[in-house]
Amino acid sequence: MNHFLACDVGGTKTLLRISAAGEGEPLLQKSYPSADYTGLAEMLDDFLREAGTSSVAAACFALAGPVSGRRVKLTNLPWEVDADALAARFAIPRISLINDFEAVGHGIAVLQPDDLLTLQPGAPQAQGVRVVVGAGTGLGVAWLSWQDGGYAVHPSEGGHMDFAPADATQYALLQHLQQHHGHVSYERIVSGPGLVAIFEFLRDSGRGSPSAQLIAAMGEGDAAEALTRFAQQGDEPIAQIALDLFVRVYGAFVGNLALIALPRGGIYVAGGIAAKIAATMQRGDFMRAFHDKGRYTGLIETLPLHIVTNPQIGLLGASLAARRMI
């Protein structure tokens, strides 16, 4: 029986799914901590061994980084993925490497209504341009345009555009980050590591002091997750200030993308962070920054805006792409 393999490689975790052609449910789906492996081939060995099959007709790998040709160096992980080497090692005749947000773009087609939280219904246009954007370990962006009876997905590295501060605090944040990185992209701020960078800026510039409990929580595990959790609990001012600043920059960035693409088919905010802070994004600062486009605020208000709440959208998109190759 023909099987197809889908893989969504992220800086924090990697999702793998193998399915039989013509069947609905996957044979096996697993999540692996990316940092536990030295490369993708080692992880695939473990996964296929557990799946109990070595017969894979097609595979699609969604990767966080620019994809050009058959070999990709990941942006937020010390891995290089070589499609031809994987094809030879695992006897997979058809392998596709795509950008992780290209996979998210494909995944939009198979989302269910309860996979979306609508922030702004707007005035959706059938076959209109769509944008997918999302912060996680990095900041991904892709466009979708209607071509030949369906949506074509266009990957980008839009998260690496220059950060443009909107007020004095953001300008001070820019100067702080320039001391560490030189060039400051939106990804330096709108990402998990970016939220931590905002916290460090606030702390180092005397704009807030963390409690001993927050310091301990950040040191014990995922620092960005700890900041988010403490901010949402409402009893840690520096975490709240950091998250509020984060969503303002996030909203402004998404608004910039809206002006560039005029996505009358909708803007879909995916990634690992948005669904976890949806209440904060609904509260006001995100939407105010999204709308704050001067003479074009009225236009921005007509564009549909959704949060994708299904964390597996990239895997769903990669699976759809792999199925099409059989």
Please provide the spans of the model-predicted regions.
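Short glycine-aspartate micro-motif
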Residues: 4-8, 56-60, 96, 130-134, ...
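Glycine-rich phosphate-binding loop of actin/hexokinase-like ATP-binding domains
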Residues: 115-187, 278-279, 285-291, 295-300
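ATP-binding/phosphotransfer module of carbohydrate and carboxylate kinases, centering on a glycine-rich
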Residues: 1-54, 172-326
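Short beta-strand-loop/turn "lid" adjacent to the catalytic site in phosphate-handling enzymes
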Residues: 51-115, 132, 275-279
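A short secondary-structure junction signal
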Residues: 108, 142-146, 201
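Short, acidic Gly/Pro/Ser/Thr-rich loop/turn segments
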Residues: 14, 66-68, 138-142, 197, ...
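Short, electropositive alpha-helical surface patch
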Residues: 112-121, 322-326
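Active-site nucleophile and cofactor-binding loops and adjacent substrate-binding regions
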Residues: 32-34, 74-78, 96-102, 122-125, ...
